[in-house]
Regions:
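Conserved C-terminal "switch" segment of AAA+ ATPases
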Residues: 121-125, 138-186, 198-203
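Conserved nucleotide-binding/hydrolysis micro-motifs of P-loop NTPases
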Residues: 72-74, 104-105, 111-112, 118-122, ...
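Short, structured coil segments at secondary-structure junctions
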Residues: 108, 131-132
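Conserved C-terminal helix/linker of AAA+ ATPases
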Residues: 182-189, 196-218
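Non-catalytic alpha-helical coupling and interface elements of nucleotide-dependent molecular machines
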Residues: 63, 90, 94, 133, ...
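Residues immediately C-terminal
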Residues: 67, 72-74, 120, 134, ...
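Conserved ASCE/P-loop NTPase catalytic core
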Residues: 1-114, 178
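Helical "lid/switch" subdomain of P-loop NTPase nucleotide-binding domains
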Residues: 78-81, 120, 124, 128
Length: 218
């Protein structure tokens, strides 16, 4: 159990003697790793000071989702990770080595998602790509989708929505200048909030704040 990855359900058995009390009933986990991932992250890590072992990330994600974000930009090479995971991805089992050298078999029962903005053909060869059978391309949003994302996020930032400012944003900073990305609404709103905090004022969608946000961001 790792409180950073696992959320207890609060479920309590009427007969506590029916299972080992060291087990905790949790919701399906969703574990996300990014550029900090190393080859040691997928192995058991032993702390010599506390003499405790920490489970690897993929074991913590069992029965849930394991997301490798920014795949290809980790400290570990993509081919090294796939070499390590060829058996787990195919057989849904993994073999981990304990500090005493004994290997133990554990389940690899999770949905593994690799996210990247690099062409997969530039990351891995054909043999490795076959181990990842489904590839889903996420296209750039349309102006209407871009607006929907902004409309959804603005209240979360405490910003009142203004349709006229959305039109200004698209015409001034996107049309004929750059493609729209799904991350742009969040990042632009972040810039607006930061600019307002610096000026000690309430964040609002104005031409001045939009221009300042885009100037800093792009």
């Amino acid at each position: 159990f790792d409180p950073q990855c696992h959320e207890p359900t609060g479920h309590s058995d009427k007969n506590p003697t029916s299972y080992d009390q060291r087990w905790i009933h949790i919701k399906r986990p969703a574990v996300i790793v990014g550029g900090e991932m190393e080859l040691s992250s997928v192995e058991i890590n032993h702390n010599p000071t506390t003499n405790l072992c920490e489970a690897p990330m993929q074991l913590k994600a069992n029965c849930g989702i394991f997301v490798v974000d920014d795949f290809g930009r980790q400290r570990i090479k993509p081919e090294d990770l796939l070499n390590r995971w060829i058996l787990p991805l195919e057989k849904r089992i993994d073999f981990l080595t304990l500090p005493n050298g004994i290997k133990v078999q554990v389940p690899f029962d999770e949905l593994v998602i690799f996210c990247t903005n690099i062409d997969p053909k530039n990351l891995l060869d054909e043999a490795f790509l076959r181990r990842i059978p489904y590839k889903i391309r996420v296209y750039d949003p349309s102006p209407e989708q871009f607006k929907q994302i902004m409309t959804f996020l603005a209240p979360k930032y405490g910003i009142e929505w203004d349709d006229s400012m959305m039109t200004y944003l698209l015409e001034r900073h996107f049309e004929g200048k750059r493609p729209m990305r799904c991350c742009h609404p969040r990042d632009i709103l972040d810039q607006v909030v930061n600019a307002a905090a610096y000026r000690r004022t309430r964040p609002v969608l104005t031409r001045e704040f939009i221009d300042l946000a885009c100037m800093c961001y792009f």
